[in-house]
């Protein structure tokens, strides 16, 4: 087997825009700036919004004039 062909792992810091700092190991040799992390993402903080997909379906049916009889 060849020696020294694997990339070298180094410890870097990933800094989020909310101020959270995460230390990780990576093959890149520079620090990262993140837009969003688990501490500020709406899914993890419980502040997520519900998207109204029912309105889109009704608009599609209206546009193409589908009725319940045609769909069955």
Curated annotation (Swiss-Prot):
One of its GO terms (molecular function) is structural constituent of ribosome. The keyword Ion transport does not apply. GO terms for cellular component: ribonucleoprotein complex; ribosome. Binds the 23S rRNA. It comes from the Bacteria. Keywords: Metal-binding, Ribonucleoprotein, Ribosomal protein, RNA-binding, rRNA-binding, Zinc. It comes from Buchnera aphidicola subsp. Acyrthosiphon pisum (strain APS). This is Large ribosomal subunit protein bL31. Zn(2+) binds at residues 16, 18, 37, 40. Belongs to the bacterial ribosomal protein bL31 family. Type A subfamily. The keyword Metal-binding applies. One of its GO terms (biological process) is translation. NCBIfam families: L31, PRK00019.1. Part of the 50S ribosomal subunit. Binds 1 zinc ion per subunit. Its cofactor is Zn(2+).
